[in-house]
């Protein structure tokens, strides 16, 4: 059987594999450690800085989540961290916040508290107030 060049990419040009059989970790496919210790550290940090969840009402969750994301900056919060901090249905809370805030969802692979690899876990980063709303507010003389 004829073999085309580069059909077997086990040499240069293919994905490098580590000893465990998975792809070698680079900056683009880094796996985030989301162990119990790391999640506890995030929750403790939020509490120390006054942005921990105070109660479970939806309105409080939205306002506190916005403050927590604002405090965390580019580090944001992923789904596991947010759930451990007390936010129920993290994606729903983020969707509600997106009505007035610009929030970016990044996807990352994590080793969860269960010790298993979870691919494509969302990490939410607050970018600021939505610019399209600012323009609409200014266009109506502040009445919106």
Q: PLM features: residue spans?
A:
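Eukaryotic low-complexity, non-globular regulatory regions
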Residues: 8-10
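DNA-binding patch around the recognition helix
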Residues: 14, 19-59, 94-141
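Short amphipathic alpha-helical interface segments
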Residues: 60-73
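Short acidic, hydrophobic short linear motifs in intrinsically disordered regions
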Residues: 73-83
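Short amphipathic alpha-helical interaction segments
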Residues: 84-96
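Short, well-structured alpha-helical interface segments that form or flank functional binding sites
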Residues: 60, 77, 89-92
């Amino acid at each position: 059987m004829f073999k085309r060049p580069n059909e077997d990419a086990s040499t240069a040009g293919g994905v490098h594999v580590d000893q465990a059989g998975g792809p070698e970790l680079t900056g683009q496919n880094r796996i985030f450690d989301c162990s119990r210790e790391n999640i506890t550290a995030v929750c403790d940090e939020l509490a120390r800085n006054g942005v921990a969840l105070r109660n479970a009402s939806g309105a409080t969750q939205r306002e506190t989540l916005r403050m927590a994301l604002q405090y965390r900056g580019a580090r944001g919060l992923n789904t596991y961290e947010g759930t451990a901090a007390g936010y129920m249905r993290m994606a729903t809370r983020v969707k509600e916040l997106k009505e007035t805030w610009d929030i970016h969802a990044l996807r990352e692979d994590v080793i969860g508290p269960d010790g298993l690899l979870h691919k494509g876990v969302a990490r939410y980063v607050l970018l600021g107030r939505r610019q399209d709303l600012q323009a609409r507010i200014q266009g109506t003389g502040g009445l919106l």
